Amino acid sequence: MHYSTEAIVLKNIPYGEADLIVTYLTKNYGLLNLFAKSPRKIKSRFGSSLEPLTYSQISFIGKEDNLQKIIQSDIIHPFQTIRENYRLFLQIANALRFLIQALPKKEPNSELFYLLLNTLLYLEKRIKPDNYILFLKVRGLSILGYLPDFKNCGVCRQELKEEFYYSSGFIICKKCSSSYHYSSSALPIPISQGVIKLLKEISTWTLNFLERVKISDKLFNEMEKFLQNHIFTVLGYNKTWDTEKNITAS
């Protein structure tokens, strides 16, 4: 079978002496791992089209239940300036990691595809990039169904008011935070009203609005810590990640 789709490279892994396994988020087929023959050779026909974050039109062949093979990759937009900004590249790589782990393979998700593509386009402008990375994480969690309910307690389901706590993937009320026995790894952590308010507001924002948003350093750091804890809880991976090893090409 022959397939064609728009795709964004999320990561690549060396395979053998000159080959690669490339992980894509595609417009039509969702998350795919594809085999690329000899792209690491100097005269490879793929050129730089398999570099992380590259947006391309790709063609591939093979049966769906096997490792399919890339036969053509034409760059639409390279996003090279993002790769060349080391700090920004690390930030986007961290966000991509949870997408790779959370998204089921070969399940189309055009909403997530366009979220990533449009976020990368805005990130190239270098206007408040932290806002766009935060937006990508929150919206990505929401699209994938991993964003916690911030309106009702995850235990008693009562409306959340005044004081908020986080435990085991849920936002809970003050009463439930003290009336249940929690394991040492799931002890309720206080969450500020500012974080809850920001979660609610982000759900209504658009990408072109983000460059006008001012988030205080204190609130931004609180939000990042909350998201880091939540992603660690629901996906179960270490908070530290060797970005060089997991997303960049050799």
From Swiss-Prot:
| DNA damage is among the record's keywords | yes
In terms of superkingdom, the source organism counts as: Bacteria
Instruction: Print the keywords alphabetically.
Output: DNA damage, DNA recombination, DNA repair
Q: Which InterPro entries match?
A: ARFGAP/RecO (IPR037278), DNA_rep/recomb_RecO_N (IPR022572), NA-bd_OB-fold (IPR012340), RecO (IPR003717), RecO_C (IPR042242)
Pfam hit, one:
RecO_N
Xref: SUPFAM superfamilies: ArfGap/RecO-like zinc finger, Nucleic acid-binding proteins
Which GO BP terms apply? DNA recombination; double-strand break repair
Q: Which family is annotated?
A: Belongs to the RecO family.
Q: What does this protein do?
A: Involved in DNA repair and RecF pathway recombination.
Name used for this protein in its record: DNA repair protein RecO
What's the source species for this entry?
Answer: Thermodesulfovibrio yellowstonii (strain ATCC 51303 / DSM 11347 / YP87)
